[in-house]
Amino acid sequence: MTTISDLPEDVVEEILPRVPLTSLSAVRSICKTWNTLSKNRVLCKAAVKKQFLGFIMMDYRVCSMKFHLRNDEGGDLVDDLSIKQVGILDQIEISEVLHCDGLLLFVTKDNSSLVVWNPYLGQTRLIQPSNNFHCSDRYAIGYDNNRNLKILRNFSDYGSSGSNKRGVSFKGNTYILAQGKIRVDSRWKIEAILLSFDFTTERFGPRLQLPFGFYYPQDLFSLSCVREEQLVVLHQSWMVSGELEIWITNKIDPGVVSWTKFLRSISCCRISIQAGSFFINEENQVAVVFDLDEYKGSETCRNQTAYIIGQDEYFKSVNIGEAPNLGRPEKYAPHIYCRPLVCSSYVPSLVPLQINQPDTRKESDD
């Protein structure tokens, strides 16, 4: 009797690339041959190209998120949205998630440790601090010229524009939004800038220009990337209600950057400066921004929401789940809700993690 493990290797290589990334663990358990093939090469490229796959933090839990992006004229741009909690991490409450070249870095909610995870290989690694972690710590992840994974901790002196303080990993370096002062007509003005941290030299590079210049403290800024090929920046002006712009790099080096406008909308709702994580799809000219639903002023229940923004003022909100009510910080203050946080679109990696070995990677402090 022929079994599935008896299939010729060329047939198996036709089957495996069609498997969704989130189903690989089940596929690997079928037989040793399938397990070996899936860990020696990335087999999900076909599926990844046809759908968005990312990871989102909801209710302090890590979830996988996937959906298909469509370009049907007059129809919905997003189809088959699926969000599932990651079983291997269901015992860990997470307050932050960062992505670098197929690896994810999590900060635990109690700030007791960091967790690095390779979703494709199914490997995790716990990192204990050399000094106690603190709730105000900020983190970035990258690698040096020898592909050694490194974590940057505490760069709070480099003030972030707005409240979105997360860095984005791009080709091994980390890029963060920051602010600088410039003198104009005998007055100091605040400008938004981009800084890069080189994990080989362990130094910040020169200031890089953003496409908007001066800004108000209430403006929303957020960084993302496209498969670690291009950086993307989102800006929503506090002064112009509903206006949102997204720019994408057409050139980026350690000392120079140039931008092209990707999308502009005047129909978008106001996104909180405490939220605004997002991703884009170039082929379909669409952006998806994550926040809570619009505040109505009196309700005690709000939903975590994906806002889909497209060409010709296409705008749609999609409810992705009820937001936990975290209570009031003060008696007459409004309720605080847990906001969704998404990392950039995920690309599988064959980089193994050093499991159960002492942590020898350098922890950088500034």
UniProtKB/Swiss-Prot annotation:
The record's SUPFAM superfamilies line, in alphabetical order, gives: F-box domain (SSF81383)
PROSITE patterns for the chain: FBOX (PS50181)
Protein name from the UniProt record: Putative F-box protein At3g13624
Q: Name one Pfam family in it.
A: F-box
Q: What broad taxonomic lineage does this protein's source fall under?
A: Eukaryota, Viridiplantae, Streptophyta, Embryophyta, Tracheophyta
Outline the extent of the F-box domain: 1-51
NCBIfam families according to UniProt: F_box_assoc_1
Instruction: Show the InterPro entries listed in the entry.
Output: A_thaliana_F-box (IPR050233), F-box-assoc_dom_typ1 (IPR006527), F-box-assoc_interact_dom (IPR017451), F-box-like_dom_sf (IPR036047), F-box_dom (IPR001810)
Identify the Gene3D superfamilies for this entry.
Answer: 1.20.1280.50
